[in-house]
């Protein structure tokens, strides 16, 4: 009964309070309505993420301003206000506690981050074939390299950008060549130590990252599990997936190159299916090799190497000349021709005061700016076929004026006159006129010959060049092409042998490539010392018999008064005649009816 009375009293007092307020009017009722509206405003501010807790507390304190007035009212009124305010503020406290930290704002900012793969078309082409990446012990860079564009970062927040590479599966693969496919070969090898490549520009603001393309072109792959250079360690013949990580600064405490990437709300990871690759130590698919050479700017050496090699093979096939494995004459070997031409008192522009010809005085005749036209040998010259007949038959008139003037400067050379060529051309019978003329490729200034007796008869073929060909000292090391006829007589009276009146072989001697006639200046070799019997046998003649069996022999000629020897390589018989002055050193038989060898003097 007492409880009922208390509740009734309470009800009656509360009802009385409300009835009194209703009867009195509207003053306190208006204040209560205003307080409820303010409490609703506080709840709306608590729902806003930008609303700080301090402002809401001020507003709540501001909303408690009606309480002094309510305290002046009866106890029932204060009880009602306490009940209502406790409900309102409990709701506000819950909302404020949920929005107290920056986590919801950060979460929303991380969700907005997007990463776009650059060079996606190139990655797609490699992926369609089956991307392969070379790994080495020292480390090898990736191609294509991972390049990404990042958007959606907070411009004022600090971020790390990192990359790691994880296995796609737990399988090991092998390449099947006949089907050009990768097949599973077994289970994967044991896991390797984790490695994370942190971009060198980290730590940077979001604005900095968004203004640039983030490139991982310096990242290297290695198969050395003991690597200490920070390279990514991978197993060969496994498939891997690169991943890009965006890590906010406040979540980067556990970030390390030798630890896995931390996981949390401040880390977002991106991967692209087209970047999956298989690690190899050597490319398995030739299509991948060609595509990388074509698209990789660092593979320029491979492209140029192949092209140069092809060009060199084409040149060698076109000219098909043997080149001696020694250094050719350079322009520096002939230095003072122009100076001595104006100031010398000798019989020729290149003759010193003692009358000795100076081969080093023809420097100005070797100017590379003045070059005769390119040509090939005539079909019957040196028994070498002319591949392009329209380039043959070049005479003196075909040379540019600068070449002809240089040739004219050599007219005072006394050495290889027209009589000397007749000695090489024919011995006993009248020689037929050679059909073609061979001139050096650069300039005729380096035409030199072998000393011959001045009493030999003349030859009309070389009259156009006879006065222009000079003789250098016999210490000059010279190469001369010789064409011998297998059907010719072995008793030819000159040192080259063969029936040259039929082959028309000796027209001129060139010392410049690519035409196989060279000049050198070397000291006398001690190996070629003259024996007494050779000295006595070679005092009177320069003649060596040349049989027709096509074998090559090295021959010595030791003229009187000379401290040098001459070697010539020409056809030699199996049994040397006792009368010739050449020692035959066989170099082997040469097929065919012609030989292309050289005479050189040291």
Swiss-Prot record:
Pfam families hit by this protein: T-box
SUPFAM superfamilies found in the cross-reference section: p53-like transcription factors (SSF49417)
Segments of this protein annotated with the region Disordered: 46-84, 338-369, 425-447
One GO cellular component, as annotated: nucleus
Composition skew (Low complexity), residue ranges: 346-369
GO biological process, one term: embryonic cranial skeleton morphogenesis
PTM sites of type Phosphothreonine: 330
Top-level lineage group: Eukaryota
Compositionally biased region (Polar residues): 71-84, 425-446
GO MF entries: DNA-binding transcription factor activity, RNA polymerase II-specific; DNA-binding transcription repressor activity, RNA polymerase II-specific; protein homodimerization activity; RNA polymerase II cis-regulatory region sequence-specific DNA binding; sequence-specific double-stranded DNA binding
Ranges of the DNA-binding region feature: 122-304
Chain's role: Probable transcriptional regulator involved in the development of the skeleton of the limb, vertebral column and head. Acts by controlling the number of mesenchymal precursor cells and chondrocytes.
Oligomer status and interactors: Can form a heterodimer with TBX18.
Disease: Cousin syndrome: Defined as pelviscapular dysplasia with epiphyseal abnormalities, congenital dwarfism and facial dysmorphy (frontal bossing, hypertelorism, narrow palpebral fissures, deep set globes, strabismus, low-set posteriory rotated and unusually formed external ears, dysplasia of conchae, small chin, short neck with redundant skin folds, and a low hairline). Intelligence may vary from normal to moderately impaired.
Name of this protein: T-box transcription factor TBX15
